Amino acid sequence: MLSGWSVLKGGNMKYWDKALLSLFMCVSTLSIAATHAVAMEGMQMTKEAREIIAHPKGTKESRGVISLQDYIVEEQAMYDWLFKNHPIFTKYGGKTVGKLVVKDRGEEWIEEGRGNDFSKASKRSGGEGFSSMMYRVARNSTLQYPNKFIGPEKCGECHPAQYETWSRSRHATTIRFPGEHPEVNNKLNDPVFDKDTASILPQGITPDVVYCTVGHIRTKFGFFDAWLLRGTYHVEGGLLKNGTGQIVAGGNQWQRTWALNLSPEVAKKIKKWVPDFPVTLEEYGDNGGYVRGLASYAAKYKKSMSFQASTSYCEVCHPWKFDFKNESEFYAALGNAKELQKHTISKGVSCEECHGAGGHLEGGSGLLISNCERCHQRFSYSPDLMRNNPLNAGKPDLALSSKFKSMGPGCGSEGSQTYFTAHYEKGMRCATCHDPHDVTGNVTGEKGIKGVSYNSEQGYLSSLYSKPKLKKECTDCHKEQAYIQSKADTHSKNSCASCHMPFMMSCENFYAIQFQDQAGFDTQRRAHIWKIDVDPARKSLVAGSTSKDPRDGKDWHFERNEEGRNFVDLMWACARTTWADKDQAEAKGCHSPVVSELKETLHFKDQKQVYNEVMGWQTPVKDKFTQVKVGIQGLYSLLEVKKLAPSDKTRVYELIEKAQDTVDLIEKDGSWGMHGFKYTKQRLDAAVEYINEAQRIMKKSL
């Protein structure tokens, strides 16, 4: 071997150098190819999905019906395709700044919300069944071909009124193609507000490689790329369509609150009150990005990103359907945004998502239902609620809470919040109050916001608020409360929802600004709980026992009162900070230390301060209420033993009835002056005088 080497070396040194260089290049090329192959081959679905795929409990073919596990099995082909064909692998060689973390239906539909733990606590299937905590799965997914969808325009032929109201609702536009964004003049790569804030699409992502955006300017915008992969990344130093630059985890989701409302000046104001509140980009940490207003959602900035097909998460509640005849046509179109858009037969929460493919038409699926729970009853199982309440033993359903996004109740959890309220127990459901065809109402767009283009035909698209049209108002049922509130002065312009349905829900999982004890600041949607808990310390939202630090976001859940129901604590009811609540804006910011226009002494920075203020109203009312009740009881006792002239007796009874009317009104109202302090006190003062006059008549007749 050595002699041969020597001969070659001595015989033709120049030739041998070239040979070595060629050999080195071949080895390098093989190494790179091997690296790419490993990157692709190393990608696999989650252990939950793999376990179900490997050990199915029967099959769709054997049962004749599709069940939860079959939805997970059918997604395998989608992930196999993505692992081979997404540009992350074909153009970038699997190299990303930040780790790829696969998320699929197995994890989202089985494990998320502690589904496996709930199954073990359940008696169903001997504790070995499946439990989809977050979703009531749609009957049809985009992976099933052919489907019977005909599209909302076809439904509108026979249901024109319903179509028109639906078409101008946010349900209709939750999914939009590039070119359908009049509120920003379709400039998806330009900063929306100031030049130092984010654009709707992140760096390196151009409209031609985007299938759709998700969301509205009121809250957030995300995107799905042309391969129907969730946009959890951006591209630095190049463009996705060219395969240039580098894929970077996070910095992917446009956030209205951060981009518009949380200016550095506002952030500094909050930081004086909340020392850990972030001001600089660096202080937003994993949740931040490269520019103000573009957060890392389903990602940690430059550390990790979810590799997640549309089929496993967002598409459940932000759906679309294609008219492809078979799977081959579908997979042939993936990667071509225009082709996917051309074959989209419905998008958004359209008619057939609730009423079934084809609706009631001959050949359709025949479903004539409303299916709000599919998207608005996201649960999460809480071991803490099971342990902490003896009444819950053996009843895992009573230990359910809502799906939380870190420390805040997530979007789509309205129904799971309502589930543990007196309203739900009495039979109230979503459609009791809401018209599912007209969920947005007659919303007026913003005309004076820099960067927002007002369009009169689609005004709601440029609106920063949401005021849904309601079939039934609070006052239709709560007449005593409505009557007293109509007499109020201090809170006369407040709606019921202002206090009883505070904006405390997170759409964005913007955990960097979630400070729940201070009732802020990642707050885009109304809570659906209603019951205000008057307590100096008890909190609506609490960390789980597994949390080493409350800010780690582990197992946060709704606390329960003595009746086992959810409640709104005083800080959230009176002093929350949100920029999404039209009612709060019209009420001069209520008592928020950040946005309130009231005098400084009415800016409440902790719950004890709110409680003391409430006691200042309720205590004198309760004292006088007790005085009136005792007085009435005393008069009835005297009437049993004293004889009065008929006219005096009649007058005493009249006075007692007047006092009792006030007692009944105050008792049914239940706010002890909070709905209208002065009027409540005036009624009680009058009731005291009725008692006094009745007592004088009794004494005169002795």
Curated annotation (Swiss-Prot):
The keyword Disulfide bond does not apply. It is an enzyme of class 1 (oxidoreductase). Pathway: Sulfur metabolism; sulfite reduction. GO terms for biological process: anaerobic respiration; hydrogen sulfide biosynthetic process; protein homotrimerization. It comes from the Bacteria. Disruption phenotype: Loss of growth based on sulfite respiration. This is Dissimilatory sulfite reductase MccA. The gene is mccA.
